[in-house]
From Swiss-Prot:
Keywords: Ribonucleoprotein, Ribosomal protein
Organism: Kluyveromyces lactis (strain ATCC 8585 / CBS 2359 / DSM 70799 / NBRC 1267 / NRRL Y-1140 / WM37)
Protein name: Small ribosomal subunit protein uS8
Pfam name, any one: Ribosomal_S8
Keyword Cell inner membrane in record: no
SUPFAM superfamilies: Ribosomal protein S8 (SSF56047)
Length: 130
């Protein structure tokens, strides 16, 4: 079976491990987008440390879970989002105001919707985490 989205597989593995109460999860293959997405999640405290393991193939990532994650997911296709429309997307995707983050890929890098609003940049929507 072919993989349609490496990021979707990674976030699905994290969700499943979190639901079953695991303390860590192995993600393979890895990509730069997954690493940046995990950095945003780590910055907001949804996951603990994560380590990239180079196996001379596609690489692996070991993520330490801390039990704070409720759900994370990918939005496919990656819709273009203007700064004014971010509020509509947060209302649709997140369970409540001031709770969780919509993660965007912008010209200034991968960041959450609040940082994108501060930097006044728009981009494509990658996913959400809460």
């Amino acid at each position: 079976m072919t993989r349609t989205s490496v990021l979707a597989d990674a976030l699905n593995a994290i969700n499943n491990a979190e639901k079953t109460g695991k303390r860590q999860v192995l993600i393979r293959p890895s990509s730069k987008v997954i690493i940046k997405f995990l950095q945003v999640m780590q910055k907001h405290g949804y996951i603990g440390e994560f380590e990239y393991i180079d196996d001379h193939r596609s690489g692996k990532i070991v993520v330490q879970l801390n039990g704070r994650l409720n759900k994370c997911g990918v939005i496919s296709p990656r819709f273009n989002v203007k700064i004014a429309d971010v509020e509509k997307w947060t209302a649709n995707l997140l369970p409540a105001r001031q709770f969780g983050y919509v993660i965007l890929t912008t010209s200034a890098g991968i960041m959450d919707h609040e940082e994108a609003h501060r930097k006044h940049v728009s981009g494509k929507i990658l996913g959400f985490v809460y």
